[in-house]
UniProtKB/Swiss-Prot annotation:
It is found in: Cytoplasm. Keywords: Aminoacyl-tRNA synthetase, ATP-binding, Cytoplasm, Ligase, Nucleotide-binding, Protein biosynthesis. GO terms for biological process: selenocysteine biosynthetic process; seryl-tRNA aminoacylation. The gene is serS. Catalyzes the attachment of serine to tRNA(Ser). Is also able to aminoacylate tRNA(Sec) with serine, to form the misacylated tRNA L-seryl-tRNA(Sec), which will be further converted into selenocysteinyl-tRNA(Sec). It comes from Microcystis aeruginosa (strain NIES-843 / IAM M-2473). InterPro entries: aa-tRNA-synt_IIb, aa-tRNA-synth_II, aa-tRNA-synth_II/BPL/LPL, Ser-tRNA-ligase_type_1, Ser-tRNA-synth_1_N, SerRS_1_N_sf, SerRS_core, tRNA-bd_arm. This is Serine--tRNA ligase. Its EC number is 6.1.1.11.
C-alpha cells in the first residue's frame, strides 16, 4: 500500500514511477478525494472550535448570574445544537471519503525501486549472471521431464485428471520420495542459514490476502471456500508474513527470517494454453518459501542475501541457472525490486523460472500494519518485507529429471539428495 503522504507531496514522481510499470494507474482521483477530505477536516475543526467557544460563553454567562433560559443564552444553545447536528452529518461523509481513498490506494501497485531497470515487459529484463554452464548435460536426446517421469513410473498425470482435472499430478513411489527429499533438503539448508521454520495454516482469511497484496486485485487467481471466508494459500508468503499483522516489533527483533514448506494453490486463470504438460504450471504444487521482516536500513542487503540463499540450493544440486533482474513493466504487483532465478531445462533448450525473490519495502507492511519501534525513540515505523522461493519443488524436480537424465533412461540422484533418498539412481 502506497503512502498517502508520499502521493500528496510528490505526485509527479509517484505518477512517473507508476507509469513505468506500463499499466493504467491514475493518482489524480486520490488527490481530488484528499482535497475533499482536507476541506471536511477544516470544516469539522472550525465547527468544533465554534462549539467549544459557545460552551465557554454559556458557562461564563451562567456563572455571572444570567438566567440559563435567557434569550441570549437560548440563542447560543440553539447555535450549539446546530453545530452538533452538522458535525454528526460530517462524520459519515469523512468515513466515506477515507474508505474511497483507501480503496483506490489498495488498487495501486508498489512503486518500482530507484534501481529497477525501466522496461515494458519481460523482453527488457536484465540478465545479471549465470552459474553452472559446466553442468549442462551434453546428451542430445533428453526427454521432457513429464515423459521420463511417466516412463519411470514416478509421475502420473492421467489418473490425476480422473481424480481432479488437468494441471494436477500424482507422484508415485520414487516420485513422491524425491518430492519429500527436496522439501527436507531445502528446509535443512535454510535452517542452517539462519531461518526459523514455520508450518502455517494453508487456509487463510481475506485480511491475510489483502495484507500481502493478493486481494483485491487477484481474487480470480485464488481458490476460495464456498461456505467460509477462507482461501487456499497461493504461497506461504501470505500466512508467514501475516504472522506479524497488526503487531509492533522492537528493532532488536529484526531481522526475522522464516522458511516454510506448504502446498500452494493457484487457479492460473491467465495462463490458458501455457505449459499444459508437466510440472511447470500446476493448480496444486509444493514450495519452500523464505520470508524476511527487516529494518528498512538493511532492506537492500537482506534482499541480496535472500537471492544468495536461493542460489545456494541450486548450486548444491548442481543445476545450471541464471539470475534475471525484472524490469519495471514485469514486476509483480507488490514488488519494488525483484530477481528471478531461472533453471536450465535442456529438453526445451531454455531457462525457466524456479524462484522469484522480491523486496516489497514497506508496501505489504502498510497493508498488514506491521511496524517496529526503535529503542529510546518515540513513535513507530513500518518494517520492510521480503520473500523468495527456496525453491518451487515441482520445477526443481523437473530440472533434476532432465539435467540428471542418463542415456539408458535412468536419472542420477544429485549427490546432496542421496542421503535423503538412500539411493544413487532412479530407475
Amino acid at each position: 500500500m502506497l503512502d498517502l503522504k508520499q502521493i500528496r507531496e510528490n505526485p509527479e514522481e509517484v505518477q512517473k514511477r507508476l507509469d513505468s510499470r506500463g499499466g493504467s494507474y491514475d493518482i489524480a482521483p486520490i488527490l481530488q478525494l484528499n482535497q475533499q477530505q482536507k476541506a471536511l477536516e477544516l470544516e469539522r475543526s472550525s465547527l468544533q472550535g465554534r462549539g467549544n467557544e459557545i460552551g465557554k460563553l454559556v458557562g461564563q454567562k451562567v456563572k455571572s448570574g444570567s438566567d440559563a433560559n435567557s434569550p441570549e443564552i437560548l440563542v447560543l444553545k440553539t447555535e450549539g445544537n446546530e453545530i452538533k447536528s452538522k458535525l454528526a452529518q460530517l462524520e459519515p461523509q469523512e468515513k466515506a471519503i477515507k474508505a474511497a481513498i483507501d480503496q483506490k490506494i489498495l488498487d495501486l501497485p508498489n512503486l518500482p525501486s530507484e534501481t529497477t531497470p525501466i522496461g515494458k515487459d519481460e523482453r527488457e529484463n536484465v540478465e545479471v549472471r549465470r552459474w553452472g554452464e559446466e553442468y549442462k548435460p551434453t546428451n542430445p536426446n533428453i526427454l521432457p521431464h513429464w515423459e521420463i517421469g511417466e516412463k519411470l513410473g514416478i509421475l502420473d498425470f492421467e489418473r490425476a485428471v480422473k481424480i481432479a482435472q488437468s494441471r494436477f499430478v500424482n507422484l508415485i513411489a520414487l516420485g513422491a520420495a524425491l518430492e519429500r527429499a527436496l522439501i527436507n533438503f531445502m528446509l535443512d539448508r535454510h535452517i542452517v542459514a539462519g531461518y526459523t521454520e514455520v508450518l502455517p495454516p494453508i487456509l487463510i482469511n481475506s485480511d491475510s490476502l489483502r495484507g500481502t497484496g493478493q486481494l483485491p486485485k487477484f481474487a480470480e487467481e485464488s481458490f476460495k471456500c464456498r461456505d467460509d471466508e477462507l482461501w487456499l494459500a497461493p504461497t506461504a508468503e501470505v500466512p508467514v508474513t501475516n504472522l506479524y499483522r497488526d503487531e509492533i516489533l522492537s528493532s532488536e527483533q529484526l531481522p526475522i527470517k522464516h522458511c516454510a514448506y506448504t502446498p500452494c494453490f493457484r487457479r492460473e486463470a491467465g495462463s490458458y494454453g501455457k505449459d499444459t504438460r508437466g510440472l511447470i504450471r500446476l493448480h496444486q504444487f509444493n514450495k519452500v518459501e523464505m520470508v524476511k521482516i527487516v529494518h528498512p536500513d538493511a532492506s537492500a542487503q537482506e534482499h541480496e542475501s535472500l537471492v544468495a540463499n536461493a542460489e545456494a540450493i541450486l548450486q548444491a544440486l548442481q543445476l545450471p541457472y541464471r539470475v534475471i533482474e525484472l524490469c519495471s513493466g514485469d514486476l509483480g504487483f507488490s514488488a519494488a525490486k525483484c530477481y528471478d532465478l531461472e533453471v536450465w531445462l535442456p529438453s526445451a533448450n531454455t531457462y525457466r523460472e524456479i524462484s522469484s525473490c522480491s523486496n516489497f519495502r514497506d508496501f505489504q507492511a502498510r497493508r498488514a500494519n506491521i511496524r517496529f519501534k526503535e529503542k529510546g525513540q518515540k513513535g513507530t515505523n513500518f518494517v520492510h518485507t521480503l520473500n523468495g522461493s527456496g525453491l518451487a519443488i515441482g520445477r526443481t524436480m523437473a530440472a533434476i529429471l532432465e539435467n540428471y537424465q542418463q542415456p539408458d533412461g535412468t536419472v542420477k540422484v544429485p549427490e546432496v539428495l542421496q542421503p535423503y533418498l538412500k539411493r544413487e539412481v532412479i530407475c
